[in-house]
Swiss-Prot record:
Organism, as annotated: Mengo encephalomyocarditis virus
Effects seen without this gene: Knockout mutants display an attenuated small-plaque phenotype.
This protein's name: Protein 2B*
GO biological process: viral translational frameshifting
Record field: compositional bias (Low complexity): 99-113
Top-level taxonomic group: Viruses
Region (Disordered): 1-28, 91-129
Protein family: Belongs to the encephalomyocarditis virus protein 2B* family.
Basic and acidic residues bias: start-end ranges: 114-129
Regions of compositional bias (Polar residues) in chain numbering: 14-28
Amino acid sequence: PFTFKPRQRPVFSDSRSGSVINGSNPTAERLGQQSYGISLYGFARCQRGRPKSNEDYKDVKFSIGCMGKCKRNIEQPGVLETTLKQMCATDCRDDDSSDASGPLDAALLGSLDSSRDHKPDKPVRRNSS
């Protein structure tokens, strides 16, 4: 009863993992993280805050996709529309609805770009719950 249309083209591609931030994610292993521009899993992840360590690397990327695309999708009709709008207003601030336009998004993307040099237990920037 509630699905998002799959994106035609990925926005950010990641050659290291074979996944994309705002499109289908062929390497995803968790339910709800496959070929939706924004999935319910992505919204839940965004609302809960960033993962605590780089072991959830794929989830970090998915959260960025959530924040970047949030307002673009909240007008989709569906049972959870009000809930999604609340999540977006709280956790996905992005005034002009473009990717990585906010300070948090930019900081997270910068962190991901250099993450290959980080130790596995290096803390990842996250929202306070």
